[in-house]
Amino acid sequence: AMSGEAEGKPAIPGVLMADMNASMAAGMSIMIALRHAQMTGEGQEIDINLYNVAMTLMPGAASLYFGSGFVAQRGNNWLTGQNPNYNIYETKDGRYMSVGCLEKKFWSNLCAALERTDLTELIEDSSQYDYIKEQLTIAFKKRTMREWEEYLVGKDTCVTPVLNFDEACAAPQ
């Protein structure tokens, strides 16, 4: 239950991640087993289950848990909304922009684009995260999603609109 807002209910992911990745794991395992049989004449047993596959899709949470006992939950780590520079912000028209500025250059570029260079160094202090999120929430509400998309072209910010499926299919890549 790591997806969704910290104070809300878990989000339904909208994609069968474990199932799809189990299929890929099965395909790779079958190819390896066939190659092994070709080389040695021996067969292989393949054992794949959705639980184990799902756990492999959360390496950050697993490394934190098994390394330090930290339990990742909604909103308490960088992948689930704790960090202001890796988050989603609502725009003026009720759409959303996804911010993925984990690298300092992208964060600096975003702060410059927002004309909020005062936030650039604050990101180093986790006690300032709530303040920075508030400031980004205010900033992103000033334009529509499309206005942000156009405004940020060429600014190298690692910020992108959250698109509907049809928009994503039509987006140039």
Can you describe what each PLM-predicted range is?
Residues 53-55, 164-167:
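Residues that form or immediately flank small-molecule/cofactor binding pockets and catalytic motifs
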Residues 2-8, 77-82, 119-121, 127-132, ...:
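Short C-terminal domain-edge/linker segments immediately following a structured domain
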Residues 85-159, 166:
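Aromatic-enriched alpha-helical interface/lid elements that frame and gate functional surfaces
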Residues 1-97, 101:
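Active-site-adjacent "lid/gating" segments in soluble enzymes
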Residues 167-173:
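Active-site-adjacent capping/gating segments
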Residues 7-10, 158, 169:
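Compositionally biased, intrinsically disordered/low-complexity regions enriched for serine, proline
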